[in-house]
């Protein structure tokens, strides 16, 4: 039998559980991101520390792009307002009256050395200067312009982080960063842009950066070279003699006084014992010659048929044209 006091205690417990459930849900929602973030940080630390322990010079590690065959994980999408261009930088850019002045201020803010001498710095300067011009044309506020430039810079960093192809991952990352600035859900996202502004910014980035995605990756990432090696089953591995060994053998033969009759024997000994490679080469040559003969015979037959058709048509054209006899007789006066 349930007493009023027990029912009240049950009600209190249910109320406490209902109040704790959203908190637990929020903690569960946050826990994967925190675990992922810690895993990403640990992964990056391992990647940066293990080459330093393996080699003494870090320059050699940086020049080896094929050490890791998998692209690095992309960062978590976050709010990036005032991330690279703060409010003072935006005021300096707004005061620039001409495009040349704006490019000078932008090169100073982005810490670009000499864009006239470095092609990469010139490309970065063109990328962000055109982005600023687009933001001015759309009437973006300083906060929106700073966030748009930060999103573009984070996208560029994700692109050049690996020489491997990751255009789909970068596009998903860019769209998730856009949503962080279009939906009001603090502290994860804010409604900084309107829907029309988000669509315009997305179209601009797709038509400019993603259209030339491979060009940016080609310029800003090191070239990866893959060497292909083939192994044939059933064949013994070839033993290649270097030229130094051949020269040493020739010197030994010259030093040792041997009759000249033995020299041709030493030269002809390898020819008397054909290797499996020679047998394979002769077989390939015989098959190729056989196929070539069949192809030549087929071409000759086709040419002969075409000549016969042409000769029959010419013979039909050379025959005199015979007019049919008239039915009516001509009348004589």
UniProtKB/Swiss-Prot annotation:
List the residue ranges of the region (Disordered): 1-70, 309-333
Q: Which residues carry this modification: Phosphoserine?
A: 34
GO BP of this protein: gene expression; single fertilization; sperm flagellum assembly
Per the record, the coiled-coil ranges are 284-319
Any single Gene Ontology cellular-component annotation: axoneme
Subcellular location as annotated: Cell projection, Cilium, Flagellum; Cytoplasmic vesicle, Secretory vesicle, Acrosome; Cytoplasm
**Keyword line:** Cell projection, Cilium, Coiled coil, Cytoplasm, Cytoplasmic vesicle, Flagellum, Phosphoprotein
Compositional bias segments (type: Polar residues): 1-10, 44-58
Q: Which domain of life is it from?
A: Eukaryota
Which Pfam families does this one have?
Answer: CLAMP (PF14769)
Provide the protein name.
Cilia- and flagella-associated protein 119
Q: What is the organism field in this record?
A: Mus musculus
């Amino acid at each position: 039998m349930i007493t009023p006091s027990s029912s009240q205690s049950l009600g209190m417990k249910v109320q406490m559980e209902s109040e704790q459930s959203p908190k637990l849900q929020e903690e569960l929602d946050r826990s994967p991101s925190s675990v992922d973030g810690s895993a990403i940080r640990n992964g990056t630390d391992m990647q940066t520390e293990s080459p330093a322990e393996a080699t003494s010079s870090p320059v050699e590690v940086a020049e080896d792009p094929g050490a890791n065959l998998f692209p690095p994980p992309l960062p978590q999408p976050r709010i990036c307002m005032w991330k690279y261009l703060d409010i003072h930088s935006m005021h300096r850019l707004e005061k620039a009256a001409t495009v040349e002045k704006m490019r000078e201020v932008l090169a100073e803010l982005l810490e670009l050395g000499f864009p006239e001498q470095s092609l990469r710095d010139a490309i970065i300067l063109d990328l962000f200067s055109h982005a600023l011009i687009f933001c001015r044309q759309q009437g973006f506020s300083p906060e929106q312009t700073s966030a748009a430039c930060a999103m573009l810079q984070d996208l560029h960093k994700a692109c050049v982080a690996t020489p491997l192809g990751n255009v789909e991952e970068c596009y998903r990352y860019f769209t998730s960063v856009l949503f962080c600035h279009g939906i009001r859900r603090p502290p994860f996202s804010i409604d900084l842009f309107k829907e029309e502004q988000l669509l315009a910014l997305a179209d601009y980035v797709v038509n400019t950066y993603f259209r030339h995605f491979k060009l940016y990756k080609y310029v800003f990432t090191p070239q990866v070279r893959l060497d292909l090696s083939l192994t044939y089953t059933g064949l013994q591995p070839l033993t290649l003699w270097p030229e130094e060994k051949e020269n040493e053998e020739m010197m030994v033969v010259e030093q040792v006084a041997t009759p000249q009759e033995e020299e041709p024997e030493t030269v002809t000994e390898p020819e008397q014992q054909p290797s499996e490679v020679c047998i394979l080469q002769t077989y390939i040559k015989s098959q190729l010659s056989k196929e070539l003969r069949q192809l030549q015979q087929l071409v000759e037959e086709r040419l002969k048929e075409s000549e016969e058709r042409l000769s029959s048509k010419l013979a039909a054209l050379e025959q005199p044209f015979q007019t049919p006899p008239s039915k009516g007789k001509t009348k004589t006066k």
